[in-house]
Amino acid sequence: GLPSQVTKHAFEVGKTVATTPGAVVFRNELLELIQYKPMSEKQYARPLLVVPPQINKYYIFDLSPSNSFVQFALKNGLQVFMISWRNPDVRHREWGLSSYVEAVEEAMNVCRAITGSRDVNLMGACAGGLTIAALQGHLQAKRQLRRIASATYLVSLLDSQLDSPATLFADEQTLEAAKRRSYQQGVLDGRDMARVFAWMRPNDLIWNYWVNNYLLGGNRRFILS
């Protein structure tokens, strides 16, 4: 196993993370849509829909009151909507990019209906960015791209031909093995994915915790995951 990076029980959604007031206003098979309570006297008419990575949680944008993109946006007059992805299991092995695109399109239309705005601003992070890029292509094909006023991408690799750390693990045999395992299990286990990301930056994400928390005794609750 690998050394743990955090104490798992130190965080609780709604108390120590994701504390910004909001409510689920829409739900479909793949996601929930959260609308946050305004934090400014006036708000812009056009809403912002944030699409997090499918392999992460929505509260990466709302870690704490002092470290929250959501609160920053709200205090600057934006109407913020956030997607919270469902954790898939073996029943959802057939979900593909088109499934996620259709789910985001539904959520986007709910944002428009709630706010009365003809269009929305989109922000996608990592795989969420790939999803909104595909959504834009889908809408362009239907001649409905005007429903999106702007799109912002955070660490979204749109050209897979470019070299990146991920290509170290992306030879044809490895990809085929990953596909077979994912289909057999129904999903790619999050722990397996975490190991891949950790070995991309071993000094920061593996040996740092091994040395400081175990060898130097910085964390007596040190465990291997």
Report each predicted region and the residues it spans:
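Alpha/beta-hydrolase-fold enzymes
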Residues: 117, 131, 136-225
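Amphipathic alpha-helical segments in well-structured domains
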Residues: 66, 70, 97-104, 132
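Alpha/beta-hydrolase fold nucleophile elbow
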Residues: 111-127
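Active-site proximal loops enriched in glycine and acidic residues that flank catalytic Cys/His/Asp
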Residues: 37, 52-53, 84-87, 104, ...
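Alpha/beta-hydrolase active-site loop
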Residues: 92-115
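Short, surface-exposed "cap/lid" segments of acyl-processing enzymes
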Residues: 2-89
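Secondary-structure capping and boundary motifs in well-ordered enzyme cores
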Residues: 25, 41, 65, 96-100, ...
